[in-house]
Amino acid sequence: MKKIVFGITSLGIGGAERVLVDIVNKLQDEYDITIFTLYGKGAFEKELSNKIKIIRLYDNSYEAMSKIKKKIIPIKVLISGKSIYKKYIQGKFDVEIAFLEGPITRIFKYGKSNKKIVWVHNDIAKVFGDNFKAKLKLKVDKKIYSKYDKIIFVSKDNENSFNRIYSDIPNLGQKEEVIYNYIDKDRIIEKSKAEIGQEYIDKNITSIITVARLVEQKAIDRLINVHKRLIDDGIMHNIYVIGDGPEKENLQNQIKELKVEDTFKLMGKRENPYPYIKRADYFALLSKFEGYGMVIDEAKILNKKIIITDTAAKEAVKGYL
């Protein structure tokens, strides 16, 4: 049985993390699978089959790390990536897959086999910005991606974005492939049946929901502004946001300033967002950019009407709207 290792920052709540758990659980009987993470105690770890092994660089979750450690660990990975690879990965697996952009790619690039794969989930042209630091990082990352035998993208737009930045990577066309995210439809439908209280999603008024990390990319601030304008125009509705992140305090302040506390709800993290999505009338994703937007596919499975901005996530609604 072939041995495969997938590398990812953590198995905390997130789109790529969700996809990885679904993939390895699906493949568990065909391959000997290990997941290598930088951080432990991710919420999705408990959803892994007991056949899947986990190697953790650190046992603690990212959230439990001190501010200093959060800054030091990525630097350590950059400096010590080769020694980390030798200790945990080298010679132990037939196929090595860096499943997410960032620190993991800096470790797995040292693989010697011809089965070294990297997965790209984000819009590379937009995720880093346009300042000097971003341009330097893109230059470094070009050398890293050049080391891989195969580069997998989650959408065609995702691939096109990558090619605009890294068109001069040797043999790039031969390395590239688009593989859309695998989603366990039955799992989503089953989890959507869980009971939630009426106080969470009020069915007496039109409801819009989104599931996203509270980061600038997801543009929740834009959603708040649109919500306020609609309320002022007499279009009454509630908006619910499932997720957490560094922009939470700023968003809370914006909600308070616009006096929409009663109609715009930040609900925090939910390990099972599906019953909330199922209960809402619409699903919205107003991101500035996306690699694909897997959550749109999940909302479609639950028969939600979709509100979306013009990003790579629009591929998910072709033929649907």
Where do the language-model regions lie?
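A conserved mid-protein helix/loop that constitutes part of the nucleotide-sugar donor-binding site
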Residues: 14-22, 206-229, 246-252, 294
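Membrane-proximal helix-turn-helix segments that form the acceptor-binding/catalytic region
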Residues: 82-92, 134-154
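A short, active-site helix/loop in glycosyltransferases that binds the activated sugar's phosphate group
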Residues: 106-108, 148-175
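Aromatic "clamp/platform" in nucleotide-sugar-dependent glycosyltransferases that forms part
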Residues: 269, 288
